[in-house]
């Protein structure tokens, strides 16, 4: 019993840092017409941080390939926003034959305080033969618990998927993400969250 309890405690400690730091808070899917079959989607992350943009678009390309969809990274095919007019962008999208365009952009930032637990020391039951040993154990099962407050930066972003031939909005929503300076991990987790939801909503 002691070994099983210890294994469970270790598992909890190992899994906690892996919990998702990106969550979808709102989403909408077009339902009054069939969802088209996608072959080629242009991914545009409207971000000032080029490293996050590149990591995110690269990961989206990799994940979409699992669904036999070619994800096109905007940082590889489009110049900076301030160097392209809307008419030119439309022409490029039309000529390239994209089925859809997925646009992601941050909307707002806010601070939130999170209570982070340090550790809990467990003392599993030893004896149940008589009342007083059990009574003593019951009050010592949790002998110590510590925590501290951590301030996080929450990035609110929106995502919109448009069909290119008629500019119809097919899929839309908002996310909250705990900002991290580990840009690679941040971008990959965000991409994974979006693709999982795309599949769940039967968009892909």
What are these regions, as identified by a protein language model?
Residues 13, 40-41, 68-74, 124-131, ...:
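A generic short-segment signal for beta-strand/edge and adjacent turn/coil regions
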Residues 77, 110, 118-121, 176, ...:
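Flexible domain-boundary/linker segments
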Residues 40, 44-117:
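N-terminal segment of the mature soluble domain
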Residues 20-40, 48-51, 66, 135-204:
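C-terminal/domain-edge helix-coil "capping" segments
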Residues 12-21:
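Helix-enriched interaction subdomains in cytosolic or periplasmic regions
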Residues 2-13:
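Bacterial N-terminal signal peptides
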């Amino acid at each position: 019993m002691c070994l099983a309890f210890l294994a469970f405690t270790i598992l909890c400690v190992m899994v906690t840092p892996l919990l998702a730091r990106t969550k979808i808070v709102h989403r909408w899917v077009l339902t009054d017409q069939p969802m088209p079959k996608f072959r080629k989607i242009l991914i545009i992350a409207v971000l000032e941080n080029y490293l996050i943009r590149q990591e995110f678009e690269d990961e989206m390309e990799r994940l979409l390939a699992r669904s036999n969809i070619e994800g096109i990274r905007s940082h590889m095919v489009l110049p900076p926003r301030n160097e392209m007019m809307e008419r030119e962008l439309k022409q490029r999208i039309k000529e390239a034959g994209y089925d859809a365009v997925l646009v992601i952009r941050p909307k707002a930032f806010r601070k939130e305080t999170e209570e982070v637990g340090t550790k809990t020391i467990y003392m599993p039951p030893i004896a149940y033969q008589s009342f007083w040993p059990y009574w003593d154990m019951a009050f010592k099962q949790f002998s110590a618990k510590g925590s501290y407050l951590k301030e996080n930066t929450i990035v609110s972003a929106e995502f919109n998927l448009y069909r290119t031939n008629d500019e119809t909005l097919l899929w839309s929503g908002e996310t909250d993400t705990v900002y991290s300076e580990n840009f690679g991990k941040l971008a990959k987790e965000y991409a994974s969250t979006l693709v999982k939801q795309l599949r769940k909503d039967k968009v892909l």
